[in-house]
Amino acid sequence: MSHAAKLSATSGRLLATAMSTKTSTETAALRHPVAKGWFVHSFTALGALCGMFGLMAVGDRNYKIAILWLAIAMVVDGLDGLAARKYEVKTHVPRIDGYTLDLIIDFVTCIVIPVMFMLRFFMLPHNPWGAIIASFVMLMSALWMSRTDQMTSDHFFNGFPCEWNMIVPTLFLLNMKPWPTAIACILLALTQLTNWKFLHPMQVRKFRPLTITVTVVWLATVLLMTADLPARNPIGEALLIACPLYIVGVGVWRTINGPTGGGDETAMPSTMHC
């Protein structure tokens, strides 16, 4: 074989190797975001485990562990949406619907477990009214979860967004009596089919740094006060009250003043779940 032929053959092999390497690299690059997408969905699915262990703790009458699992579920729920948007999971893993996945988990961790918690730890009246009120909360929450207009375009919720996983631990740690607890639950449930605005703790741009700070302080306070039970903590109790008042206050402000940041009242499904 002539020198030119050898050179040509060598060049061909090098080109083929380069093309093969490029193809492998491109394939790996394509697989990489898919792997990230599956990781995000798996992280979201951890909320189901939090729900299972939380429900077991309620059944065992272990309120400290139950609140801990609810808190962990809240952290997962707060982070998975950010990760899903960052890694574009809808594009890279379209066979899994993150909205449906989160909706299923939220129904357990945000509604079922908190309602069972109230019944198990006698937070509601001991007579049949307790079961009736719990049933009303479940019914209204199921209807809210099915709303097609859960959120406005500026990311405020229409009606109370089933955040019973925040309300119930707060009322429990405040040692609220059964009937005041029942009245608070009824009032919140009654708003669920209205267009009264409630603040999304992560997505509303207006006051976002303050909102995130208030939410983190509330969560830390819940964990610290739960660990210290049955001791009372007046400062902690004041912080527990401040967070719901802030959320309700911003909701009242938004309801009265209308959309923020160029948003409008256009209804859309909630993005709290994706």
Predicted regions and their residues:
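Lipid-exposed faces of alpha-helical membrane segments in multi-pass integral membrane proteins
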Residues: 43-49, 69-72, 76, 108-111, ...
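Active-site-proximal cofactor/substrate-binding loop regions of enzyme domains
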Residues: 30-86
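Multi-pass membrane catalytic core of lipid/isoprenoid biosynthesis enzymes
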Residues: 40-45, 86-144
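Helix-coil boundary and interhelical linker segments in multi-pass alpha-helical membrane proteins
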Residues: 53-68, 108, 114-133, 171-182, ...
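Short, amphipathic, aromatic/basic-enriched membrane-interface segments that mark the entry/exit
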Residues: 32-42, 96-104, 150-158, 201-208
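Hydrophobic alpha-helical transmembrane segments and immediately flanking/interface helices
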Residues: 35-36, 126-145, 199-206, 250-260
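Cytosolic, membrane-interface loops and tails of multi-pass inner-membrane proteins
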Residues: 20-31, 79-98, 155-158, 162, ...
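C-terminal membrane-associated helical module and adjoining short loops/tails
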Residues: 2-27, 157-274
